[in-house]
Design a protein with these regions (language model features):
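Non-catalytic alpha/beta scaffold blocks inside enzyme catalytic domains
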Residues: 2-178
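Non-catalytic, alpha-helical, charged scaffold/linker segments
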Residues: 156-167, 182-198
Length: 198
């Protein structure tokens, strides 16, 4: 049976490079391919602009079983803005805006390099948050540590990364290959900012 709730990369949907986000709520509602306990969404305003059918999506988000429980039991939602999806969430994790957080598009995500060179894109914060928010990636890293997930804890059980900025700089899948391989410098030891373009 499919491993993903959106059935991406199955014989039904073999061409799914970016996933099938528009299928997540309807599949969770139908318990197809399996039942889930919690739907965790990030900046995906599925109640409005990504659903292709707003009325049907809202009905699925509010539908209840005969025992009175919601068919989609728990919804956790993280966003920088109070989108339509917030109204249906049981837990809301306020996120930073793109001006307030570190972020990257790396070789491990959607490569933006060329065949003969590696390249990364980095987002560097330009303002500090003026409210009680945390970057979603940092929240996930914290959850990874709290759940003792491999790769997020040290051998001593301590957090492997303090936040997403730390993760971007230190994480490597293989020597020299991590979220910011292009920002490690010629010696492979630098991080965060590369040398000026020549």
């Amino acid at each position: 049976s499919p491993a993903r709730i959106d059935k991406a990369f199955t014989w039904e949907n073999p061409m799914s490079a970016h996933g099938l986000m528009h299928m997540v709520i309807s599949n969770a509602f139908a318990k197809d391919p399996y039942e889930i306990d919690t739907l965790f969404l990030y900046m995906a305003n599925m109640a409005w602009n990504s659903s292709m059918n707003t009325q049907s999506t809202v009905e699925m988000l509010t539908a209840k079983n005969s025992d009175g429980d919601y068919k989609i039991k728990n919804i956790i939602y993280s966003d920088s803005y109070s989108s339509e999806m917030v109204a249906y969430a049981d837990l809301i994790l306020p996120d930073t805006t793109y001006l307030e957080r570190y972020d990257c598009i790396s070789l491990l995500d959607r490569p933006i390099g060329e065949p003969d060179l590696i390249a990364d894109a980095i987002r560097w914060p330009v303002v500090k948050p003026d409210r009680d928010v945390r970057g979603f990636q940092s929240v996930l890293i914290d959850l990874g540590h709290r759940l003792s997930l491999p790769g997020f804890i040290t051998e001593e059980g301590k957090p492997a990364y303090s936040d997403y900025e730390d993760y971007m700089k230190k994480h490597e899948r293989k020597p020299g290959i991590g979220p910011l391989a292009g920002f490690r410098g010629l010696d492979g030891k630098s991080n965060g900012r590369g040398s000026p373009n020549q």
